[in-house]
Amino acid sequence: DAVRWAKSDLELFAPTVELHRLIRENSKDETEYKRFVDSLKASVLTAFYTPKEITDTIADVLADYSVRPARMLEPSAGVGVFVDSMLRHSPNADVMAFEKDLLTGTILRHLYPDQKMRTCGFEKIERPFNNYFDLAVSNIPFGDIAVFDAEFQRSDSFGRRSAQKTIHNYFFLKGLDAVRDGGIVAFITSQGVLNSTKTSVRNELFSQANLVSAIRLPNNLFTDNA
């Protein structure tokens, strides 16, 4: 009901109604429709989708340095813009991608039916995929969102245990776990990873990997894709 909407949000009313119509028409029943909607609501704070120009540029730079992975990981895939950009240069790559939002994950699976597209959180990745991938690339979620990981919780490293408190720190360390020795982690993330006054996670990162490059992007770069 548009009457209940704030005047500043009214321009979003019609697209929202259309989205609900499409979800309802493509859900097998009311229960599935509600699951899709609830999943969308749960992802609102972390769903910042990446402009294609950014993913293409990162893929091009990696290719210029002869980074053409046979095994690629995308831990927060959205609808697969990074997957698409990377497959232009490495069409035969085996890709494993994670997308926690139910609706977005369903779209992702339909777009890439021949790849391993998983509709669940990155924390669900299994131990056999440690030291497995040549490249992990993503615009990872960020913020003070906790992630529980039993392996991290049992770790002797304070940095690994504390990384569970902020999702971007967790994704970095979990991504490093997943790539092989000599592999590359290429993530877009918030300033908190480098700027935080707490150093335990950074120390853990630098104990496991060498920093190849870090580029600061404008803080409004993803506003139109939020």
Give, region by region, the residue ranges found by the protein language model.
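Short loop/edge segments at beta-strand edges and connector loops
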Residues: 118-122, 215-216
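Glycine-rich, phosphate-binding/catalytic loops in enzymes
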Residues: 90, 114-115, 152-156, 202-205
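Conserved proline-anchored active-site loop of SAM-dependent methyltransferases
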Residues: 56-88, 97, 108, 120-155, ...
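Flexible, glycine-/basic-rich loop-and-beta segments that form/coincide
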Residues: 223-226
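Class I S-adenosyl-L-methionine
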Residues: 1-111, 115
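Conserved Class I SAM-dependent methyltransferase catalytic core
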Residues: 58, 100-102, 163-221
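Glycine-rich phosphate-binding "P-loop"
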Residues: 45-46, 156-164
